[in-house]
Amino acid sequence: MIKKFFIFFVSVNLFAESIVVDGNLDEPEWQTAFKITEFYESDPYTLRKTDDETEAYIFSNEDGIYVGFINYQDESTMLSNRTMRDEMSSLSEKNSINIDFDGDRTKAYIIAVALGDSLFD
């Protein structure tokens, strides 16, 4: 059975009035957000298209940068292994974003969340 999972991922500023960090992407701002639907496997580094549909939304305003994910995946295939905080294991399903504010590819902010409620930043 395919289930639809919503993960609200990150907000640089959690005190914005327009976006509520509640796991739902139902605010009107998400309708105008930049949408990404093409994803590739990076661990292992095969760069093949992923089998499961994922939608990522990026929205920014003067209050911050907001990223939301909607993951569609058969529940029986989910890996929700618990990992230690800040452990970037390939043994679990996760969504992550990298932000290189300088655009020079020498440093970036990496933020991730996994099915087992593990966090990485």
What do the predicted segments below correspond to?
Residues 2-14:
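Sec-dependent N-terminal signal peptides
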Residues 15-121:
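Structural preference for beta-rich elements and adjacent junctions enriched in aromatics
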